[in-house]
Regions:
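Eukaryote-biased RCC1-like beta-propeller repeat architecture
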Residues: 2-492
């Protein structure tokens, strides 16, 4: 019988058991690197796997990469290109995959908090441990605090009639949408265009209301454009509602829709993995790396080489011709950005103020590789009006475009300067950024430790910093989260 009082070393465990532990938990690439550097058990080669893996930690990283939802969808040539771009190190491949995943969803901080940040026109929404807080200004209800609370100087709790936890949020000019852990979707804000999806309710909705038209259709993602909304179901189907003047709903016509309708074009084309809503156009990424665009062709935002509107989703062929597998996109007001499976970035649309990052202000009629970032691995792209942010896999941030009240984060630049090529934000170099979002004139970032930094205009309290009117340098926002006065969530 085994001696229960005897202590065991981890090195006495069978290698296959240790490997199972490493790959069945929630370890990130940094965890594997720490184990490898601190214990010889994880540094050594123990005959459990081919010699091409120098350590158990490296083999565990490979196994985690194989199972990752992004990596498993890549064709073999794209997998190899990513591996080569990561210097032949599986832990770095894993870091890239996990960083891409975090940057567009929930960030798990080192302190154990779960966070997501998103910015609207003059407001900011924050998920903090499954609860939503908002700050800023909105007369149309986008803050979610009722008709008597149209401005919040600090992050204030938004209440929901559902007990389910919030897992995803999107903010636009004048409305917001929330996805719950249950798959339910809630919206609030200006519904004069029916973008909130509640039928013929042409009024502002000041507190989150459940979108009943999506009952029985669990969703995982939402994207809010200017007066329209896009929903992505867990099964990978796309639904849209709201203004459809330019065909941005992708339904083959220009009729507005008061409730979400399925975009049938995607049926049979494989699962959709990401949606992005611009001012009057929509981008959709499928699991095979194809990017579809529809809506207003103004400023070449659709990426088809012309400015024609598209009423149906249309694949951007320049990506297909070059076998570029896109994993994430961002829809700005006048331009768009894409991130491919090897961390390369492409921009197109209106080049005013250098928002495309090519060193000039020229427009790009179709996606163009951003060569100045080719030596980096980007994990998030974020576009808004005349500016673009690029989050790199080491946690640093690059930006280009119009300074716009300091919203690019370069304190040595004037508030109306133009930055025509991506430059690293030295002001954030001492922090590892996990997610970034930019509004009209303000920007907010979350670090891997759960710190929040904001910069740009704060005239309407959109930074949640009541003592500042604005700041050129990223400034930490100390959360003083509270309940807004007289907030009572409206029952659906």
């Amino acid at each position: 019988m085994a001696d229960r009082n005897r202590s065991f070393s981890i090195e006495e465990l069978p290698s296959h058991l240790i490997l199972d532990i490493l790959t069945s938990g929630c370890l990130c690439a940094a965890d594997l690197a720490s184990l490898e550097s601190s214990c010889r058990m994880f540094r050594g080669c123990h005959g459990l796997y081919p010699l091409k893996y120098p350590s158990m930690a490296e083999f565990a990283a490979f196994e985690l990469c194989k199972a990752h939802s992004i990596f498993s969808c890549l064709p073999p040539n794209a997998q190899k290109e990513l591996f080569d771009r990561c210097g032949g190190i599986w832990k770095r491949v894993l870091r890239f995959l996990q960083s891409v995943e975090r940057s567009c969803g929930i960030v798990e901080t080192s302190a154990g908090n779960q966070m997501q940040i998103t910015t609207g026109r003059y407001h900011t929404l924050l998920i903090h441990d499954s609860e939503v807080y908002s700050c800023g200004s909105s007369i149309c209800g986008a803050l979610g605090h009722g008709p008597d609370n149209t401005r919040c100087d600090n992050f204030s709790l938004v209440k929901f009639p559902s007990l389910s936890r919030v897992v995803h949020v999107s903010a636009s000019h004048n409305h917001a949408a929330f996805v719950m852990q249950s798959g339910e979707v809630f919206t609030c804000g200006d519904n004069s265009s029916f973008c909130c999806g509640h039928g013929e309710v042409g009024r502002a909705i000041f507190r989150p209301m459940r979108v009943e038209a999506l009952a029985g259709i669990p969703c995982k993602q939402v994207a809010t454009g200017l007066s329209f909304t896009v929903f992505l179901s867990r099964e990978g189907h796309v639904y849209t509602c709201g203004t459809n003047t330019h065909g941005q709903l992708g339904l083959g016509d220009t009729l507005d829709r008061p409730t979400p309708k399925i975009v049938e074009h995607f049926e049979g084309l494989g699962s959709v993995v990401q949606i992005a809503a611009g001012a009057s156009y929509t981008l959709v990424v499928s699991s095979d790396g194809t990017v579809y665009s529809f809506g207003s062709g103004t400023n070449f935002c659709l990426g088809h080489g012309d400015q024609h509107n598209e009423l149906h989703p249309r694949a951007i062929l320049s990506f297909k011709r070059k076998n570029i597998h896109v994993v994430r996109v961002s829809s700005g007001d006048e331009h768009a950005v894409a991130l491919d499976s090897s961390g390369l970035v492409y921009t197109w649309g209106k080049g005013y103020c250098g928002a495309l990052g090519h060193g000039d202000e020229n427009d790009k009629t179709s996606p163009a590789l951003l060569t100045s970032l080719s030596s980096y691995l980007a994990v998030q792209v974020c576009a808004r009006k005349r500016k673009t942010f690029f989050l790199l896999d080491d946690g640093s941030v690059c930006a280009c475009g119009w300074m716009g009240f300091g919203s690019l984060g370069f304190p040595d630049r004037g508030t109306s300067d133009k930055v025509t090529k991506p430059q690293i934000l030295d002001s954030l170099k001492t922090h590892h950024i996990s997610q970034i979002s930019t509004g009209l004139y303000h920007t907010v970032a979350v670090t891997n430790k759960g710190l929040i930094f904001g910069f740009g205009d704060n005239e309407r309290a959109q930074l949640g910093h009541e003592s500042l009117r604005g700041c050129l340098k990223p400034t930490e926002i100390v959360l003083q989260m509270r309940e807004a006065t007289a907030v009572e969530a409206e029952s659906a």
